């Protein structure tokens, strides 16, 4: 029996209709895995050994009672076969410390999804720089004058922090907008933090597509998140409407180009964000949209993921 751990935000407060971590737990349970639930505060390191308080867990598709803790124990993390790191951003120093704890278990043979070092190495915004021919024109800077010059060149740009999620603090600055200065000062905290600028992509009106990649293999369907009511952002957390779709030829090309790098880095479950034919983000911390896609198309993304985990465990 496979012993699967999961590190996540409190399960009591999730929305099971759209929670991808919950979908993973349902599939793992269906396969007979022993489930061990952890929150960040449960992880600890003692004399170099990674340990945790874990609670054994059962889950069910029931909107009134979707989980039950069936036991509690303190154990060495390397006694688990695999651990899903599904804590949502912010990707802060606490998150980084947790990856070091998980890495100690990884060194003793536990499979961590996604690989702790790669979670640290691959910032969701900056990692796109390694595939710059696939992205919009992109500037990463703290410098207000550089941001202004970029805006003057493109006349319609998107500004965003490097550590946000769900569309938080994303600004569109059009030609003639008097607010560029204050937005730049806010995002860079007066020149002390980096932010990202990209030229605005009109294709956003047709959706910001979330393309999932499982151990290097693209999932053939994506979720297009379409901005509503004059909003620039398609993120579901920002009120976007989700529309599952098959991948386009350009989606396939982008995902197949990046897939081998993701697989080599131990990034087993990743969400690419694509607008039109341009890559905008590579989400590695806790990508979502499984449930929306599975509800519309005859595919088990969680099945693909568990197959990939089992294949890696057999190596």
UniProtKB/Swiss-Prot annotation:
Cofactor: Mg(2+); Mn(2+)
Metal-binding listed as a keyword: yes
Glycosylation (residues): 256
PTM annotation: Glycosylation at Arg-256 by NleB enhances the glutathione synthetase activity, leading to an increase in glutathione production. Glycosylation may promote C.rodentium survival in oxidative stress conditions.
Cited InterPro entries: ATP-grasp, ATP_grasp_subdomain_1, Glut_synth_pro, GSHS_ATP-bd, GSHS_N, PreATP-grasp_dom_sf
Catalytic activity: gamma-L-glutamyl-L-cysteine + glycine + ATP = glutathione + ADP + phosphate + H(+)
Enzyme class label: ligase
Protein name, UniProt field: Glutathione synthetase
Annotated organism of origin: Citrobacter rodentium
